[in-house]
């Protein structure tokens, strides 16, 4: 996988209550590209953050229909990846090069 693709796979960390609970279990949640595969996500996290990834779980969330003044609008679909890190490893997002 080339260096350009690595930066396009991970869109950023996903911050929520559920992500905070997952962090206590050694998982980190990322928003990823819609066409990203599990092996690509694993390789990107390992190369960018210098950690060992034990597993990747991916989910697709469909965007909700929301009513607006001008009718209906649709929120964007997102793809999230729950990345399980090896025992004792952690990612510090503030200390990334």
UniProtKB/Swiss-Prot annotation:
Which family does the similarity line name? Belongs to the universal ribosomal protein uL23 family.
What this protein is reported to do is described as:
One of the early assembly proteins it binds 23S rRNA. One of the proteins that surrounds the polypeptide exit tunnel on the outside of the ribosome. Forms the main docking site for trigger factor binding to the ribosome.
What InterPro entries does UniProt report for this protein, alphabetically? Nucleotide-bd_a/b_plait_sf, Ribosomal_uL23-like, Ribosomal_uL23/eL15/eS24_sf, Ribosomal_uL23_CS
Q: Per UniProt, which keywords does this protein have?
A: Ribonucleoprotein, Ribosomal protein, RNA-binding, rRNA-binding
Q: Enumerate the PROSITE patterns for this protein.
A: RIBOSOMAL_L23
What Pfam families is this protein classified in? Ribosomal_L23 (PF00276)
Where does the source fall among the domains of life?
Answer: Bacteria
Q: Which GO terms describe its cellular component?
A: ribonucleoprotein complex; ribosome
Task: Please verify whether the record's keywords include 4Fe-4S.
Answer: no
Gene Ontology MF annotations? rRNA binding; structural constituent of ribosome
Protein name per UniProt: Large ribosomal subunit protein uL23
């Amino acid at each position: 996988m080339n260096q350009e693709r690595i930066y396009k796979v991970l869109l950023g960390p996903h911050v929520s209550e559920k992500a905070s609970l997952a962090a206590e279990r050694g998982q980190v949640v990322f928003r990823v590209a819609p066409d990203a595969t599990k092996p690509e996500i694993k390789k990107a996290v390992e190369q960018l953050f210098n950690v060992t990834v034990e597993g990747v779980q991916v989910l697709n969330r469909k965007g909700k229909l929301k009513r607006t003044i001008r009718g209906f609008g649709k929120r964007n679909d997102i793809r999230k990846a729950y990345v399980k890190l090896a025992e004792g490893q952690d990612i510090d997002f503030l200390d990334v090069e």
